[in-house]
């Protein structure tokens, strides 16, 4: 699509820096660069050292000009990059002059949107740009770059082509039932192709689920009675003294958040106030916030003191209520029992696992640790990753919630097509289910996308990208 306006924005982070970059894209970009510098021409892809002048021919700054001639640019339009000195005063003065010469302020993600609009990249690749910038771990950054280079798109397009081909095959079977060279619905060919597509979707969905964990991380909450060692555990996992630790019960009175990376997984860790009955107004507010955090957690680490011979399941029942079967009213898949102060128990020659068997039998996993000696911490990290299903493949791909939603809807439509074929031999319904599956899968790369979806996606980008 041809855009009639020329957009500009500062492309480097706000603040002091050695270099500040202003990016322009659009039909006037080249002319603006010439007017700004007094030069008559620029050679594409060759850096030119220039001075930048205001309307009165005063020097605003000096630096490099890079010219990317359409369509051989990021956006597919004429693109100019002005590389001057960093610092907001110089950058804002230079940008204001660019606006005087006819450019408009770029909106969030507008450069990437134009690249998408001009078929320089698909929606998956555009999102991967933002995900690479926002990555909180090396694994997430690497996965985003793989998606940016088209690895994820290639997998989606392969299945999309198979869906289109199969849909055409089914429609041909309906339209030409008497042709000898066209197979019918009952010959097994269509079912075989459907099964292969189902297998491909299952594999891609599994990879995408790992990619979503890489991108978003998980929200993990530490909870338990006062003085159980929650804050000490947060410090152990964070590798630094983030929470105040004392022998006084109730030291933590509010939630404390820390983002850490363990085994490649980003964990948004929240320490909470100890759960108990209290008349202290401030502590009660902290406990209310703790329960709110617990309800929103992807995983709860229920910390208890091994030296106090606490039954963790009884503790969980006291804190969260008891089900009709006598077990805690809390989903075992979202709960990890953490026996702390293991060193104190073992120093006495006692076993730290005396209650573990009971918990395991009932489906509640227990890990015993010592924040003092770091015993059990590696096992806790491994159990945490396993609990949330984090097992990324070597060549993982970044993914978002909308990708998973689209993949699941595609799976549902393909499963429906298989059912219509095997049970009812209903060719028209098979073709319709395949059409819906094709549409759902195409949403991922942007082949089929509503304008409001595109607005939400590109609106979340930073200015200048």
UniProtKB/Swiss-Prot annotation:
The positions annotated for binding (6S)-5-formyl-5,6,7,8-tetrahydrofolate are: 23, 81, 120, 465
What does the record say about how the cofactor binds? Binds 1 potassium ion per subunit.
Q: Please report a single Pfam family linked to this protein.
A: MMR_HSR1
- Give the gene name: mnmE
Q: Does the keyword Magnesium apply?
A: yes
- Among the entry's GO cellular component annotations, what is one? cytosol
Q: Detail which positions bind GTP.
A: 227-232, 246-252, 271-274
Q: TrmE-type G domain spans which residues?
A: 217-389
**InterPro entries with a match to the protein in the record:** G_TrmE (IPR031168), GTP-bd (IPR006073), GTP-bd_TrmE_N (IPR018948), GTPase_MnmE (IPR004520), MnmE_dom2 (IPR027368), MnmE_helical (IPR025867), P-loop_NTPase (IPR027417), Small_GTP-bd (IPR005225)
Q: Where in the cell is it found?
A: Cytoplasm
Q: Which CDD domains match?
A: trmE (cd04164), TrmE_N (cd14858)
Q: Which GO terms describe its molecular function?
A: GTP binding; GTPase activity; metal ion binding
Transmembrane ranges, per UniProt, are none
What NCBIfam families does this protein's entry cite? mnmE_trmE_thdF, PRK05291.1-3, small_GTP
Spell out the family assignment given in the record's similarity comment.
Answer: Belongs to the TRAFAC class TrmE-Era-EngA-EngB-Septin-like GTPase superfamily. TrmE GTPase family.
Q: Kindly state the subunit structure of this protein.
A: Homodimer. Heterotetramer of two MnmE and two MnmG subunits.
Species whose genome carries this gene? Psychrobacter sp. (strain PRwf-1)
Q: Per UniProt, where does K(+) bind?
A: 227, 246, 248, 251
Q: Which residues form a coiled coil?
A: none
Q: Locate the residues binding Mg(2+).
A: 231, 252
* Full protein name: tRNA modification GTPase MnmE
Q: What does this protein do?
A: Exhibits a very high intrinsic GTPase hydrolysis rate. Involved in the addition of a carboxymethylaminomethyl (cmnm) group at the wobble position (U34) of certain tRNAs, forming tRNA-cmnm(5)s(2)U34.
Q: Which cofactor does it need?
A: K(+)
Protein EC = 3.6.-.-
Keyword entries, A-Z:
Cytoplasm, GTP-binding, Hydrolase, Magnesium, Metal-binding, Nucleotide-binding, Potassium, tRNA processing
Under Gene3D superfamilies, the record lists: P-loop containing nucleotide triphosphate hydrolases (3.40.50.300), Probable tRNA modification gtpase trme, domain 1 (3.30.1360.120), tRNA modification GTPase MnmE domain 2 (1.20.120.430)
**Record GO biological process:** tRNA methylation; tRNA wobble uridine modification
């Amino acid at each position: 699509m041809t855009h009639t306006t020329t957009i500009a924005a500062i492309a480097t982070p706000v603040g002091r820096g050695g270099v500040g970059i202003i990016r322009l894209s659009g039909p006037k970009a080249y002319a603006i660069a010439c007017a700004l510098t007094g030069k008559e021409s620029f050679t594409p892809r060759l850096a030119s050292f220039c001075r930048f002048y205001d309307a009165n021919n005063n020097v605003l700054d000096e630096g490099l000009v890079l010219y990317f001639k359409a369509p051989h640019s990021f956006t597919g339009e004429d693109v100019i990059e002005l590389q001057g000195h960093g610092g907001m005063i110089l950058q804002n003065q230079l940008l204001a002059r660019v606006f005087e010469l006819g450019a408009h302020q770029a909106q969030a993600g507008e450069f990437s949107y134009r690249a998408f609009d001009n078929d320089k990249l698909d929606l998956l690749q555009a999102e991967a740009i933002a995900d690479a910038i926002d990555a909180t771990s090396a694994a997430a950054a690497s996965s985003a770059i793989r998606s940016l280079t088209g690895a994820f798109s290639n997998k989606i397009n392969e299945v999309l082509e198979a869906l289109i081909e199969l849909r055409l095959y089914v429609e041909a079977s309906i339209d030409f039932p008497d042709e000898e060279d066209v197979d019918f619905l009952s010959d097994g060919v269509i079912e075989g192709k459907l099964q292969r597509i189902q297998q491909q979707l299952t594999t891609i969905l599994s990879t995408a689920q790992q990619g979503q964990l890489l991108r978003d991380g998980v929200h993990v909450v530490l909870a338990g009675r006062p003085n159980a060692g929650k804050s000490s555990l947060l410090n152990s996992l964070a590798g630094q003294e983030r929470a105040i630790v004392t022998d006084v019960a109730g030291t933590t009175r509010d939630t404390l958040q820390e983002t850490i990376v363990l085994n490649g997984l980003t964990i948004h860790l929240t320490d909470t106030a100890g759960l108990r009955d209290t008349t202290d107004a401030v502590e009660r507010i902290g406990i209310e916030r703790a329960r709110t955090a617990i309800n929103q957690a992807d995983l709860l680490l229920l910390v208890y003191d091994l030296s106090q011979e606490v039954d963790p399941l009884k503790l969980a029942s006291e804190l969260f209520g008891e089900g009709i079967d006598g077990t805690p009213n809390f989903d075992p898949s979202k709960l990890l029992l953490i026996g702390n102060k293991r060193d104190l128990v073992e120093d006495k020659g006692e076993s730290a696992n005396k209650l573990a068997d009971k918990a395991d039998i009932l489906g509640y996993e227990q890990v015993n640790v010592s924040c003092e000696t770091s015993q059990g911490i590696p096992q806790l990290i491994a159990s945490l990753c396993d609990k949330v299903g984090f097992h990324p493949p070597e060549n993982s791909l970044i993914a978002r919630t909308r990708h998973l939603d689209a993949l699941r809807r595609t799976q549902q439509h393909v499963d429906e097509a298989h059912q219509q074929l095997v049970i009812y031999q209903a060719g028209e319904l098979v073709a319709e289910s395949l059409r819906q599956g094709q549409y759902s899968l195409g949403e991922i790369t942007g082949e089929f996308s509503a304008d409001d979806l595109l607005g939400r996606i590109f609106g979340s980008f930073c200015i200048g990208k």
